[in-house]
């Protein structure tokens, strides 16, 4: 058993960052990435937020596939919900921009693909001063990349000129 910090939903790079931020031994993400929800998979990060070796990933997959990983209730770790992850990850993202950078005066269409960025993405861009038109920000667990995101770039192609935005992301 291991102790777990539950921090989602957060985009995959956010989990990599928070793994390092919290000095965790490793991070785990359940993600459909740029696919539809049926293609959800598991991604693992090492304590530095980097990708695990292929060998270690295969070993974990074998253990999960065998169904042999069992523990008594006394051996289980604890799970704790952490609530500051979005604020911290948003702060980190903003800090990667040049000091004093602002998006003020820009009209931006932001397509979050009904995925894990649906909260942190709009807040980040709005806090940086953008006039924001968010789309794909209503996830229900089954609509990731459904008529939005990477599977439907036409949503941005139509929305950006339709609202006279400066750009679409």
Question: Which ranges hold each PLM region?
Answer:
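Ferredoxin-reductase
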Residues: 1-48, 161-168
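Gly/Ser/Thr-enriched, mixed-charge loops and adjacent short helices
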Residues: 40-163
């Amino acid at each position: 058993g291991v102790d777990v910090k539950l921090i989602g939903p957060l985009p995959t790079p956010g989990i990599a960052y928070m793994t390092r931020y919290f000095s965790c031994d490793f991070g785990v993400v359940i993600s459909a990435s740029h696919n539809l929800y049926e293609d959800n998979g598991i991604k693992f990060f090492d304590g530095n937020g980097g990708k695990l070796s292929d060998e270690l990933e295969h070993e974990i997959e074998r253990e999960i596939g065998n169904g042999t990983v069992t523990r008594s209730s006394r051996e289980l770790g604890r799970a704790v919900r952490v609530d500051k992850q979005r604020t911290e990850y948003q702060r980190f993202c903003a800090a990667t921009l040049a000091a004093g950078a602002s998006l003020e005066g820009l009209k931006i269409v932001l397509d979050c693909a009904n995925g894990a960025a649906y909260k942190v993405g709009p807040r980040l861009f709005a806090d940086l001063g953008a006039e924001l038109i968010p789309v794909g920000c209503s996830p229900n667990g089954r609509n990731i990349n459904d008529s939005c995101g990477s599977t439907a770039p036409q949503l941005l192609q139509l929305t950006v000129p339709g609202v006279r935005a400066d750009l679409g992301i």
